[in-house]
């Protein structure tokens, strides 16, 4: 009988998405990590106009956008972006395995 080899998955890391210029009632982040569904809602916990949410992601590259009241927008604080299949741009996030 052969011994089973266990494949260790890289640990997921907590990533904070932050959007400061979002005068909207519903603020979400969507990307390849959520099948482009706006599942992760950002909240303004302190009432200062700074919306945040934490998402657990494995190391890798992720394309994403913010969705503010149904309008898709780039992350203006992130200078990294790539073209998408719709002729617009997506923000690009690199999550490393470093601690």
Identify the role of each PLM range.
Residues 1-3:
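A general sequence property marking short-to-moderate contiguous segments
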Residues 9-61, 71-98:
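Aromatic-rich carbohydrate-binding modules that target alpha-glucans
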């Amino acid at each position: 009988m052969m011994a089973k080899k266990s494949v260790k998955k890289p640990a997921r890391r907590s990533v904070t998405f932050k959007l400061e210029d979002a005068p909207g009632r519903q603020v979400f982040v969507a990307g390849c990590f959520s099948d482009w569904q706006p599942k992760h809602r950002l909240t303004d916990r302190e009432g200062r106009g700074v919306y945040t949410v934490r998402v657990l992601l494995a190391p890798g590259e992720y394309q994403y956008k913010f969705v503010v009241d149904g309008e898709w927008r780039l992350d203006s604080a992130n200078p990294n972006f790539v073209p998408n299949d719709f002729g617009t741009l997506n923000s690009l996030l690199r999550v490393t395995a470093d601690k």
